[in-house]
Amino acid sequence: MKKLLMAMLALVMMAGCSSETAKPAQVEKPQPKPAEFVTGRAAFQKLFIAARGWARDAQPYRLESMITDDSKGKEGKSAVWRASFGSPLQRGVKAYTWSGEVSSDRGINPGTEDTYSPSNTSTQIFDVAFLKVDSDQALETAQKHGGEKLLAKEPDTPVLYILDWSRPTNELIWHVIYGNNRDDYKLRVAVNASSGDFIRVEK
């Protein structure tokens, strides 16, 4: 009888152990990566590679940052950049957007293709070799010409960066815009994207 009781006790203990080990291990959900903020040149390098996959002769005609709830353009960086490219061979233009935000659109996203016209001044392509000055350096220059004073008074003012070619002056320009967009702004400073020199306060 004693042996029977001991055998039954052993079986109960074994069942308890097996039930403990049978419990599925709790798997921790991977934490989303924090938002990534980069300068214009850093984003452009990624976007240029993507554009060359579309057309081997693709050249940029505009690079611009995007203002979002999490990205206000401080320190010359943004969480979203869009570069537009033209291809004379394919007679097309196409935009690519890089996003470092915590969303499903994170990474590089291509836009739709449109028709390219060499005579269109708004799609004037330029050689990437002219881009020697980054957006954070352009901001430093703009800060010395009114930006620092403006942000001291209104620190919540977003800063937007637009890079394009000026056909009249034949130079690549960073437009550092203190405001919501190219038309709605409090200050707009033009900086040479090859030398970093101050050009003018734009009207």
Regions found by a protein language model. Give the residues of each.
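Sec-dependent bacterial lipoprotein signal peptides
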Residues: M1-A15
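Long, terminal "pre-/pro-" and other extracytoplasmic accessory regions
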Residues: L5, C17-K203
